[in-house]
């Protein structure tokens, strides 16, 4: 019980909303020819770092790359958007990233110390009913040629939605990522499999390193027009405010965490005074995800200086006067 209590804050549910192609076929002549249909794709994931990296199975998210909303739910009820940043097909693993404070990364265990008969718990979000845990034992261990663990077999129930969740030992330490079941009926028959945490964590570190190297940072704001003397006078009653007017802020993004709000004006980023969108893009693209950035804003007649750590995403600002 103590092990479950310790590990449960680190296990999340994964929900995705995507385009539904079935809706086009069902549309009648008097309906819209195309509309959006929300569909939930459910799975689980494990928080493995306090800066927002989550491990899950690739098959949980491999059909979600074109979706318009991916979200994770924490054990405490908080929900936040997530970005799939990298994946490992060979080991059926994927890494997500979220921008959120006060995360509880799971303690990493040593699957090499596991023995057949050890008690284990599978924690996940089966069938959209919230987080649950199932008890089982290590049924079998398959080793590589160098005697390291390659797969853990367990009879702890891995039901639909549990994929990508945590297999923990009695101390609450992660020893595997729940991945699949063997079943002729499609239902759980007491034969489940987990990727050892040693393999999963090694893969995750390599994937994250490559993802950071390949991506520039992401602030998470949509800006409107660049302020001129005329628009500054209209919006703020004075003609000397220059910068980019913030129209919206990504939920869970770096800008949101910094406290940036719609209606703010971004006047300076790092040491660059902002006159148009390119000035913001230049500074963001010079930094990697996770790096700190200084943003100066104008709000309610005052100039504020905010700090935040950039996230993952495409650094692109919507501004009709600037082509990215």
Where do the protein language model's features map onto the residues?
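Gly/Ser-enriched beta-turn/beta-hairpin loop segments
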Residues: 22-38, 85-91, 140-152, 182-187, ...
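Conserved active-site neighborhood of the chymotrypsin/trypsin-like protease fold
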Residues: 49-124, 128-132, 145-150, 160, ...
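C-terminal recognition in membrane/secretory proteostasis and scaffolding
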Residues: 2, 83-84, 97, 115, ...
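Short loop/turn microsegments at loop-to-beta-strand junctions
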Residues: 42-44, 68, 162-165, 244-246, ...
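A conserved glycine-rich beta-strand in the N-terminal activation segment of trypsin-fold
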Residues: 1-2, 21, 32-53, 79-81, ...
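Active-site loop architecture of trypsin-fold serine endopeptidases
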Residues: 38-39, 60-69, 103-105, 123-137, ...
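Conserved hydrophobic positions within beta-strands
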Residues: 45-47, 82-84, 138, 246
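N-terminal activation segment of mature serine protease catalytic domains
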Residues: 1-28, 34, 44, 53, ...
